[in-house]
């Protein structure tokens, strides 16, 4: 089981500024670039030079590029979903930020593949075009891996929602004189997750994740609120106040809430 948490995803301003300087524009889309992705791009550039300067090796270069990107995809999966980074980098756990950056790195590779394909196509014989279908298979592999990472992000938050909804259902609100901690914790952790995914993932992906997470929050918290034993007017006011806070914070993240 891979330890997955929301910890450590809200970087300080200096870190944010540094990360903004590590963006790569591909077409009209901007991608965050980690060191590993930068090294991959350098190696792909070397392959491109080989293809242009020695077109007689285009078929071989195609195979090298495909195999190289397959290894990148596989290694990314092992490091993040397989928790390889915990062993190689000494991390205590894999955070939502690690997952989001991994997904972004895959998006960058997917954005570069069409250009690589066109470059190779210009240096292949017509009878060799069938080899280009390997790029389609590669893109599908990248996409499937991305879906797994997105699902893991949803799973992280789903686990936290379950914890907080159970805690709320078991809270004696009649003895509380302040905010309900389960709701406070849920608001904080949801905000943390979406600060991360908004920073590193495309808007369409963020929307997909938010829809799934908010559906889970709505269902579980509704059941938990119904289960709360309210016996005093103050307890009722407290519960209503915190539910309104939850709605306000969720709406701030996604206006469709």
Model feature map: region roles:
Residues 1-175, 193-205, 209, 213, ...:
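Extended alpha-helical solenoid scaffold regions that build the rod-like backbones
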């Amino acid at each position: 089981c891979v330890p997955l948490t929301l910890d450590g995803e809200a970087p300080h301003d200096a870190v944010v500024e540094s990360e903004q300087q590590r963006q790569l524009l591909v077409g009209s889309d901007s991608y965050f670039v980690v060191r590993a992705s930068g090294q991959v791009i350098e190696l792909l550039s070397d392959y491109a030079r080989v293809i242009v300067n020695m077109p007689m090796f285009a078929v071989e270069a195609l195979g090298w590029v495909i195999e190289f990107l397959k290894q990148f995809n596989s290694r990314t999966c092992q490091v993040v979903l397989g928790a390889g980074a915990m062993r190689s980098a000494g991390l205590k756990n894999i955070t939502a930020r690690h997952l989001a950056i991994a997904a972004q790195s895959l998006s960058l590779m997917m954005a570069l593949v069409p250009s690589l394909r066109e470059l190779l196509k210009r240096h292949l014989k017509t009878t060799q075009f069938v080899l280009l279908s390997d790029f389609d298979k590669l893109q599908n592999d990248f996409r499937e891996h991305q879906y797994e990472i997105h699902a893991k992000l949803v799973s992280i938050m789903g686990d936290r929602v379950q914890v907080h909804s159970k805690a709320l259902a078991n809270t004696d609100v009649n003895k509380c004189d302040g905010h309900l901690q389960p709701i406070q914790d849920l608001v904080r952790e949801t905000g943390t997750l979406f600060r991360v995914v908004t920073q590193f993932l495309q808007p369409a992906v963020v929307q997909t994740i938010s829809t799934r997470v908010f559906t889970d929050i709505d269902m579980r918290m509704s059941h938990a609120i119904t289960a709360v034993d309210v016996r005093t007017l103050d307890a009722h006011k407290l519960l209503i106040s915190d539910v309104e806070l939850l709605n306000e914070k969720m709406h701030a993240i996604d206006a469709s809430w």
